[in-house]
């Protein structure tokens, strides 16, 4: 055993001094230090309403962020006391007002409804929809309750909307989920290819780290995006491709790299399978055809290939622009194929690196937090995987269903079909974030019984809930989170939760106990201690970690098997090029270009894409309550190219109506060359609480990748026309 005494002392659960924690927003996973409102010799720090607030600063000792922090992280403490749900509330009908009730009554009603639903609908009449905002302990207890004890795999999360295509792609190509690269590779790469990610706004601290080096020279940046985002503005090469043409582009780059001879033949022969199949596919993507499919110039394609081929080490980053597509898995595997072609994986400065959107989406993947997964990167369809988990959980063989559960959108379809009788939503806001949101809202309204477990009240989803459960949130509960580079951080509680709010895992465990199962955990550390044993021997082995070790030694990357020594050095996967398939070989996974599910036509001639802004987060449940961020981004808008603005007689700031086959919205126009002709952009953060007719997802459709189940939120066909009033942007 290693000696923990050389590390920092254990941090107590409730702090009277500076506390170390993790930012609860994006997947970069920045370390934060929270300073109490009252300090000796200083006036108490208060917000505009006079409430004492903790001051937030970057943790310089955190290996992932090195003391940097963005506006969201810096202001997060301003949101924790506003509009909180403090007590359980119930109403028998959606037409009734909520009434405050006790926890005993709330849990009795919840458990009675679960049992009644099982009797009336069967086990699969129950659905649970969670979130990448969960801590790992929350995720794990939910999996044990739903998939183990209740016997249904109908547990999905909002990670289905952002990361499931990356999960599928890694699994297909490398044999398992898990990004092989780390943040240090940004410091080492000679060429960085960013596909479908506005990293500068959506993962700003990570981009700032690379940008410092990029300014010094010696590394080239290629950005693939239909918009000229702040990320693309500083690129050495911006490829403004047609929405949905990523597979064609990546296949075309493969054609060029192969013709240039940038092929590692020994590696391909000894460490991979499927190369000949890939070669047969990319033969259909010579430069001229690729240019036609993508809308790019042949010269741009050749330059991109030259920049990659001339790099000794090249790294790729991707995010929602790749994943949120009917070809999400195909796009990601097409990118991984290029790394296999060039042996740029498992080595410093290279690798295919997906950026998670949420702070613990990675932890959710490790714990099995999607409808087809089990803890430890296992799958419900694998008999041995089910048996492994049943044994660890002390359940009879056959307790876990072999049938993958309903994905997020399939839950909506289940409500429409009358097949779902009980829906439990936690830490997310599907009444804004799901595609075709008006249809989703209508389905939610049909739910016989919906539980909403959240820290805030109201949210847009409150409208569709019967039972509200108050949840403790960031700063109020202790637990762990895993960021995009597989680094696990202990997030210590340093504030008391308001009212009667409870940690999510405690709520799940109490429901399990009331239903007759053993959920006897003394604290979150005990939950984590059980969970990490489920990962022993798996690619995501965390069995050597504990809350105590993380508190004393600081954040650690996995794999971290039992007996491993703590370190701040970076870890990569597949360093010996032995991949997670049984034979140790990676797989080329080629696909043909298909385009978007809903291409533009005469009636709907434009393509709408949606995305994030720098300051806001998801549906504004937190950031909408922070003055500084609202001043930074006061309203929704639509970006339109000057050519299209002239065509439709639209001027800067004018109100416009955008319509799709599903709905419409009204936005002020922002006329800019940052968007490609024929394409519109609307930010996705505004729901009914924050604007009138500004829901981006009223326009989007639910067509999804057939492999990952991730909806194509990034492209739908729309029409636009000028309205009468004007706005100030």
UniProtKB/Swiss-Prot annotation:
Gene Ontology molecular function, alphabetical: 4 iron, 4 sulfur cluster binding; metal ion binding; molybdopterin cofactor binding; nitrate reductase (quinone) activity
The enzyme's E.C. designation: 1.7.5.1
Co-factor binding details: Binds 1 [4Fe-4S] cluster.
Cofactor(s) it depends on: [4Fe-4S] cluster; Mo-bis(molybdopterin guanine dinucleotide)
A Pfam family this chain is assigned to: Molydop_binding
CDD domains cross-referenced by the UniProt entry: MopB_CT_Nitrate-R-NapA-like, MopB_Nitrate-R-NapA-like
Classification via PROSITE patterns: 4FE4S_MOW_BIS_MGD, MOLYBDOPTERIN_PROK_1, MOLYBDOPTERIN_PROK_3
Reaction equation(s) it catalyzes: nitrate + a quinol = a quinone + nitrite + H2O
Its job: Nitrate reductase is a key enzyme involved in the first step of nitrate assimilation in plants, fungi and bacteria.
PANTHER family, sorted: NADPH-FE(3+) OXIDOREDUCTASE SUBUNIT ALPHA, RESPIRATORY NITRATE REDUCTASE
Family the entry assigns: Belongs to the prokaryotic molybdopterin-containing oxidoreductase family. NasA/NapA/NarB subfamily.
Record-given protein name: Nitrate reductase
Species name: Synechococcus elongatus (strain ATCC 33912 / PCC 7942 / FACHB-805) (Anacystis nidulans R2)
Organism lineage string: Bacteria, Bacillati, Cyanobacteriota, Cyanophyceae, Synechococcales
Gene: narB
